[in-house]
A protein has these predicted regions:
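Zn-dependent metallopeptidase/amidohydrolase metal-coordination segment
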Residues: 61-132
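Short amphipathic alpha-helices in soluble, non-transmembrane regions
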Residues: 13-21
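Midchain, well-structured core segments that form catalytic/ion-binding scaffolds
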Residues: 1-11
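Short beta-strand elements
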Residues: 27-33
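Juxtamembrane "pre-transmembrane" interface segments
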Residues: 33-40
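Structural signal for hydrophobic packing residues in well-ordered secondary-structure cores
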Residues: 21-25, 56, 60, 128-132
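Short, low-order "capping/linker" segments at domain edges
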Residues: 40-58
Length: 133
């Protein structure tokens, strides 16, 4: 699994991986490319990111903006041409263990900085309202 950053392509990284293996005497290893997609990035100054930050701050959360995620998703469909739209992840709820047997989402929270399911859903309404301003 290779995670790309801007200005990289899957083909370029695959070629570099094969060259790296060959230089170290592992040229006989077969690398199977099963698919992939381009990296994605959105400016922190994009209106959708500013709207997300505004909602989080109103709820007493000082957000940390991460330019890259440990996970992956095909965001390039939105951020690359021809759409060239901003994209970001947002929410006041909490979950973990994504895509695993122990995946969870907090339904009712006792932590004032972590919304339960209802607060998380309402945060999207607030976010869309902020974005529409």
């Amino acid at each position: 699994d290779l995670r790309l950053v801007p200005n990289q392509t899957a083909e370029e990284v695959l070629a570099k991986l094969k060259a790296h293996l060959a230089r170290r005497g592992f040229g006989d290893i077969e690398v199977n490319f099963t698919g992939g997609y381009s990296p994605t990035a959105t400016s922190p100054d994009a209106p959708i990111i500013k709207a997300q930050v505004a909602v989080l701050k109103r709820h007493g959360i000082d957000p940390v903006l991460w330019p890259r995620l440990a996970g992956s998703y095909p965001g390039f469909v939105f951020t690359d041409a021809p759409l060239s739209l901003a994209a970001g992840h947002f929410g006041l709820g909490h979950g973990g263990g994504a895509h695993a047997p122990d995946e969870y989402l907090v339904i009712e929270s006792t932590n004032p900085k972590v919304s339960g399911f209802d607060g998380a859903a309402l945060s999207y309404v607030e976010y869309l309202y902020e974005l529409a301003k």
